[in-house]
């Protein structure tokens, strides 16, 4: 379950000043997240829909509803997962 504070934090990361202040950034989509996981970026947290929950093998994951994912996504049609990485 995603708290309101987490939703506010992730939504704030759409703006550059908050990404710099929190030293975090957002990645959306399975392919982009997998590429970042294979690189040197450190995963802060991963939010996935129930459909993708079993296919992800990290311990830092949370199931998120489609409605909440739509709230925090920068895309008009959100993907099934969203990750927050440390800069």
Q: Which role does the model predict for each range below?
A:
Residues 1-51:
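Boundary-proximal intrinsically disordered activation/regulatory segments immediately upstream
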Residues 52-59, 75:
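Short loop/helix-cap segments at secondary-structure boundaries that form the rim of catalytic
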Residues 23-24, 44, 60, 79-81:
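A generic secondary-structure signal marking the coil-to-beta-strand transition
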Residues 56-69:
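Active-site regions of enzymes building and remodeling cell-envelope glycoconjugates
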Residues 23, 62, 71-74:
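Short gly/ser-rich anion-binding loops that grip negatively charged ligand groups
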Residues 48-49, 62-64, 85:
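Short beta-strand elements of ligand-binding domains
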């Amino acid at each position: 379950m995603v708290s309101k504070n987490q939703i506010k934090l992730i939504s704030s990361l759409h703006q550059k000043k908050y990404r710099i202040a929190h030293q975090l950034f957002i990645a959306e989509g399975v392919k982009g997240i997998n590429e970042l996981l294979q690189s040197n970026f450190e995963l802060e947290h991963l939010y996935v829909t129930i459909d993708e929950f079993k296919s992800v093998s990290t311990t830092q994951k949370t199931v998120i509803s489609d409605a909440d994912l739509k709230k925090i996504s920068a895309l008009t049609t959100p993907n099934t997962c969203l990750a927050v990485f440390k800069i």
